[in-house]
């Protein structure tokens, strides 16, 4: 439990129906009593039971400046595990700010970013992975991303890691007894049993790591470069995916000279689109700079949509683009399928994950592209209710644990003795405990909560 009582606006900034100011800490009820007067004079704020609500006025000194509701939560049955009071006022920014100022004048301290969730973690209300899921669910744009975050918030990842820790802990207890007490009649673990336990743990961790990239796409989105020759239909594609005329489209080649950016929601995936200048040889210095930026965006992108004009034969520029896309997460969109085809798609098939005929002027192509992107990025294979890793911290810890388990298996197979196996299992357990936050350093914890906004 923390000694200070904190206050902050817990709802989004700006005008709205209501705003919520949250108090948490040992003096929450006392602070609330100084800024909230119940409409029923027989009600005592400091004696309010948990999970109850009172209607009344918000005051600063003798000035009642708004009416609203106070919700009461008694420790440990609250979000933070502390005494909590949530004050719901009208949603104007000025009213909410004044209510926070009144709380601070009444003895509360301003909350730091993420301090409520940090207290929930420190008070044992949630694991570190669940705390990270809070931020993921706040920032989720799509249904699947929100479902993944909710699964972690509900403890799916913590439970899965707990299962693997339990298996390794049981193994380590037996190994430690055999190594540390040789005079006792402790049966030696046979290689077959070690292989079975370690192999199962490695398989589970491999599965989490394998699905990380697809999960990250659902949570965070992906940068997507739209590339191709002039007039292939790149800007038309951008407008199709955006749902409005974001880019200028003309029959004049080279209309787009700089990178045009637009974030769109394509199915459950947020694409940060970059419509680039048409790729061709040019003596125009301005256009040449745009083309240089086009190649740079292609090299940096997590997804490439390469647009080809299906009504014209392949050109040298088309082939150069295809070669640049080889081995990358790239989809070839052969545009203008509504016109007679003169494009030999077989020539570039080996350079792309998929080659798809589309018409960027038709709404139906949007669904086709969305399905192709989901297949390529693997998001259509993700179970949104299963355990998943979120963020580089969790991925790094899971990878260290997997590598340590692999080292233990190598020690078994190499006949290095149970001492070597025990050291590797210890390393794996340390990594898993860091993942869940059980032995995370103060620096790691600070890094996690730095991502949070004030009020959460």
What annotation goes with each model-predicted range?
Residues 1-147, 151, 155, 331:
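A glycine-rich (often HGG/GG-containing) alpha/beta subdomain
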Residues 2-9, 13, 143-265, 282-284, ...:
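C-terminal-of-GTPase-core extension/linker across diverse P-loop GTPases
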Residues 16-18, 51-53, 300-304, 327-330, ...:
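Short glycine-/polar-rich loops that comprise or flank the Walker A/P-loop
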Residues 54-66, 70-74, 254-282, 300-303:
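Switch I (G2) and immediately adjacent beta-strands of P-loop GTPase domains
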Residues 109, 270-272, 354:
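Conserved beta-strand segments of alpha/beta enzyme cores
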Residues 242, 277-278, 302, 309-310, ...:
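Short glycine-/small-residue-rich Rossmann-like dinucleotide-binding loops
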Residues 273, 307, 333:
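Generic enzyme active-site microenvironment
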Residues 287-311:
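Inter-motif core of Ras-like GTPase G domains
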């Amino acid at each position: 439990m923390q000694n200070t009582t904190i206050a902050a606006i817990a709802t989004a900034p700006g005008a709205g129906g209501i705003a919520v100011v949250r108090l948490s800490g040992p003096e929450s009820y006392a602070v609330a009593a100084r800024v909230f007067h119940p409409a029923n004079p027989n009600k005592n704020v400091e004696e309010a039971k948990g999970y109850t609500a009172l209607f009344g006025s918000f005051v600063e000194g003798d000035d009642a400046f708004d009416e609203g509701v106070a919700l009461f939560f008694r420790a440990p049955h609250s979000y933070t595990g502390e005494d909590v009071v949530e004050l719901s006022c009208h949603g104007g920014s000025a009213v909410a700010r004044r209510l926070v100022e009144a709380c601070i004048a009444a003895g509360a301290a301003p909350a730091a970013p993420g301090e409520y969730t940090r207290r929930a973690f420190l008070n044992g209300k949630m694991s570190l992975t669940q705390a990270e899921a809070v931020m993921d669910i706040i920032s989720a744009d799509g249904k699947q991303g929100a479902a993944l975050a909710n699964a972690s918030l509900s403890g799916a990842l913590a439970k899965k890691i707990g299962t693997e820790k339990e298996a390794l802990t049981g193994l380590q207890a037996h190994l430690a007894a055999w190594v540390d007490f040789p005079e006792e009649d402790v049966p030696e673990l046979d290689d077959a049993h070690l292989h079975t336990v370690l192999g199962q743990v490695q398989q589970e961790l491999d599965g989490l790591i394998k699905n990380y990239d697809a999960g990250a796409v659902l949570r965070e989105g992906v940068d997507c470069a739209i590339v191709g020759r002039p007039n292939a239909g790149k800007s038309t594609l951008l407008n199709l995916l955006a749902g409005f005329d974001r880019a200028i489209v003309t029959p004049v080649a080279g209309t787009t000279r700089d990178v045009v950016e637009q974030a769109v929601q394509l199915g459950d995936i947020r694409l940060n689109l970059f419509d680039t200048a048409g790729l061709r040889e040019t003596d125009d210095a301005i256009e040449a700079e745009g083309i240089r930026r086009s190649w740079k965006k292609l090299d940096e992108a997590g997804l490439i949509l390469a647009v080809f004009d299906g009504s014209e034969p392949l050109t040298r520029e088309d082939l150069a683009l295809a070669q640049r896309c080889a081995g990358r997460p790239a989809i070839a969109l052969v545009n203008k399928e509504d016109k007679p085809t003169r494009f030999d798609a077989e020539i570039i098939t080996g350079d792309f994950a998929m080659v798809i005929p589309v018409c960027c002027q038709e709404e139906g192509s949007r669904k086709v592209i969305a399905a192709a992107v989901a297949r390529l990025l693997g998001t259509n294979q993700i179970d949104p209710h299963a355990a998943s890793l979120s963020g580089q911290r969790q991925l790094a810890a899971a990878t260290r644990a997997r590598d340590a388990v692999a080292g233990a298996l190598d020690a078994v197979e190499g006949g290095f003795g149970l001492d070597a196996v025990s050291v590797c299992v210890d390393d794996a357990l340390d990594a898993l405990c860091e993942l869940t936050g059980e032995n995370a350093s103060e620096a790691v914890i600070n890094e996690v909560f730095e991502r949070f906004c004030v009020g959460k």
